[in-house]
């Protein structure tokens, strides 16, 4: 019998994937996600009847230096199952990650700031850039970042940009 299920599907399918497996899980099985936006997950978890834990490794394959995880962060949602949080604290500590605990709301506010602001700034840069024969270092680095951001999963970008806290953050740009 499973004690923990980690849902790592694309954000678009997180809740539907849970709905597929919940009927076959024991009642005491902890369900968890690693989604980058937590909108609607708190309500889902509270209605699921299962203990839950929610985390967000604040890095991905596009820009993270997987050889230096000590430079990367992870958020563990402070709401939910105590043992599930302990499991992820231990796992992330073993990986050398910097660990922070936030509520669901604090997490989504942080994501609105730390992801949507750079993403929108990159979209603006991409919209106005033109070919440079002799680009400077800053231009080349930002171009590399822009290519990475624009190659992210479209639904992930949509979820980040439609996070309820994003519009207030982007309005400050």
Residue ranges and their predicted role:
Residues 12, 58, 105:
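Residue-level "edge-of-site" marker
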Residues 2-45:
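Rossmann-fold NAD(P) dinucleotide-binding segment
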Residues 2, 14, 85, 139-142:
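A general structural signal for well-ordered alpha-helical segments in protein cores
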Residues 101-173:
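An accessory alpha-helical subdomain
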Residues 16, 80-87, 125-136:
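Short, basic, helix/turn surface patches
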Residues 37-99, 108:
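Rossmann-fold dinucleotide-binding core
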Residues 4, 65-66, 111-115:
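Short secondary-structure transition/capping segments
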Residues 3-6, 48-50, 71-72, 117-120:
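Short, hinge-like loop/turn segments at secondary-structure boundaries
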């Amino acid at each position: 019998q499973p004690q923990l299920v980690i849902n790592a599907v694309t954000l678009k399918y997180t809740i539907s994937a849970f709905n597929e497996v919940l009927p076959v899980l024991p009642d005491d099985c902890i369900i968890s996600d690693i989604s980058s936006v937590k909108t609607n997950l708190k309500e889902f978890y509270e209605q699921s009847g299962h203990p839950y834990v929610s985390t967000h490794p604040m890095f991905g394959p596009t820009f993270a230096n997987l050889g230096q995880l000590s430079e990367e962060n992870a958020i563990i949602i402070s709401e939910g199952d105590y043992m599930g949080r302990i499991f992820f604290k231990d796992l992330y500590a073993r990986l050398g990650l910097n660990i922070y605990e936030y509520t669901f709301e604090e997490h989504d506010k942080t994501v609105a700031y730390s992801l949507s602001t750079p993403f929108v700034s990159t979209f603006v840069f991409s919209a106005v850039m033109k070919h440079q024969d002799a680009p400077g270092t800053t231009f080349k680095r930002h171009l590399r970042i822009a290519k990475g951001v624009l190659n992210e999963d479209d639904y992930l970008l949509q979820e980040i940009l439609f996070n309820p806290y994003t519009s207030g953050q982007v309005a400050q740009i």
